[in-house]
């Protein structure tokens, strides 16, 4: 077998997955160029938890410490009822110490900034999205939104839920609506919020998550069973959320009161059913472009990070492109697709409305010892590809 030790990788999308791939390829000595639709990487009001399995992947490319320094590590994690009563807890501080790996809660834009710095801003082309491609078997040419084109050895679609690369590779297929919408915001810390305490509260057809992300900020999110396509009138999002969640336990009302209405983002939650192929020829997919999932396990960005690290290892192996992409899929597809399915099922369980069903669910969760839940996290970390 002839090893291909020099190749240029085209990456569609400067999200977490695309930038992580660019970092990993640069570290491996390969050339990568990232093409991003947005004309600037803005501070969008959302946070992300880099779970321990993703931190393990980042350590393989030398980025774990830099990411950890930019965020905050939680000491405790719990699922609660609207009254504040505990359904279950996870001893995350103990697990971080045991596994020697951090869990990092961080502003999404801050994570993106760390990745951009290590990828090299000079390798990112803003305001130029990949809109199509042609693979001639020897090279792949990507068409860009400004009418130009660029040729490389590999094209990676890391362009998200509505990926143009995926559309060209697998065709158009409808998104699957979860049955619930979401709101996200960043609040300044409030006195009623416990430092280091991450929580998700389950109410009737609604949830509220609280995630301290460091730098005096708290990321929060809310979900509500609702038809797709709903919109809030300007200035009304916070009022509506306070009507729904204002009677829930602290610090939820205080976080909503401290968040400007124009800093609240609403998004319907979709995924796509898992597929059995991500690649064809010299083109492959990564992250939400390959396996978009609901956010219930907190694994969307984490699986994109895992994808990126594994794909970089496969491309750096020197194997022919098609063989490298086949190995990437073999290492990643089953794990990522399992996350899609598990996250979907958890969302349906967490969004229950029936009082009887919720009572039974909460009672069953209380019967599960925290040691068993912790074992599941350990297995996830230790099985990272």
Please describe what each predicted stretch is:
Residues 197-230, 238, 242-248, 269:
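Active-site substrate-recognition segment that forms the wall
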Residues 366-385:
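C-terminal auxiliary extensions adjacent to catalytic cores
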Residues 163, 182-184, 206-209, 290-291:
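Histidine-centered metal-chelating micro-motifs
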Residues 2-9, 51-186, 190, 225-242, ...:
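Conserved N-terminal helical subregion
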Residues 41, 98-104, 298-301:
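Glycine-rich "substrate-gating" loop/helix at the edge of Rossmann-like oxidoreductase active sites
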Residues 9-39, 156-157, 183, 241, ...:
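Conserved mid-domain beta->alpha element of the FAD-binding
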Residues 232-266, 321:
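Flavin-binding catalytic cores
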Residues 40-56:
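Conserved N-terminal glycine-rich FAD pyrophosphate-binding loop of Rossmann-like flavoproteins
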